[in-house]
């Protein structure tokens, strides 16, 4: 029986259908202003898209093990596609040169997490220092990698690569986003705190 997956676009669409009305309802319930509502909506859409990109396409029953040829070049299970040595993957890529595909993935990982460095301090005062937002970035990135490994174990095959270098790159992306936040904070409303709607 052939493998089936939940496609990325379908997962994102389903997530948006559930999330957007929920955010709007919560905003109406809390009587927040239009600015905070806009920021919350943007953050919710970003999270749905990010989760969709990180975890889909996802195998759904009935599935089959990946064909052997798809495992070529990787360490065999049960030591799956996991790298716990910092800068190993980055170092190999730099030594042998980045091709277009690798460069696109690298830049994509940075840009994918950059909005997190904007939204966290914008929505929550506790994340408005570089140390705090960096700590959050490390925690979130580690959680993503650990979840990918756990799902691979449950599925019986590694459907995602888990790499400590992804954590490093993601943190760089959040730091970039935080720098952008510091710049745009000069022109945006001072604090999108919850205020009763007028």
Residue ranges and their predicted role:
Residues 1-159, 178-198:
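Bulky hydrophobic segments
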Residues 160-172:
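Individual transmembrane alpha-helices with interfacial aromatic-anchor signatures
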């Amino acid at each position: 029986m052939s493998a089936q997956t939940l496609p990325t676009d379908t997962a994102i669409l389903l997530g948006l259908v559930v999330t957007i009305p929920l955010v709007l309802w919560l905003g109406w319930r809390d009587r927040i202003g239009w600015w905070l509502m806009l920021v919350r909506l943007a953050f919710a859409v970003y999270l749905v898209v990010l989760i969709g990109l990180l975890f889909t396409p996802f195998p759904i029953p009935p599935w089959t093990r990946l064909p052997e040829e798809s495992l070529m070049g990787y360490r065999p299970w049960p030591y799956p596609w996991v790298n716990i040595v910092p800068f190993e993957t980055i170092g190999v890529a730099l030594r042998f040169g980045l091709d277009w595909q690798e460069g696109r993935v690298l830049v994509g990982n940075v840009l994918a997490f950059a909005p997190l460095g904007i939204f966290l301090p914008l929505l929550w005062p506790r994340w408005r220092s570089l140390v705090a937002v960096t700590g959050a970035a490390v925690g979130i990135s580690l959680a993503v990698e650990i979840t990918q490994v756990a799902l691979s174990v449950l599925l019986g095959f590694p459907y995602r690569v888990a790499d400590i270098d992804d954590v490093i790159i993601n943190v760089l992306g959040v730091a970039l986003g935080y720098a952008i936040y510091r710049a745009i904070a000069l022109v945006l409303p001072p604090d999108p705190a919850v205020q009763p709607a007028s």
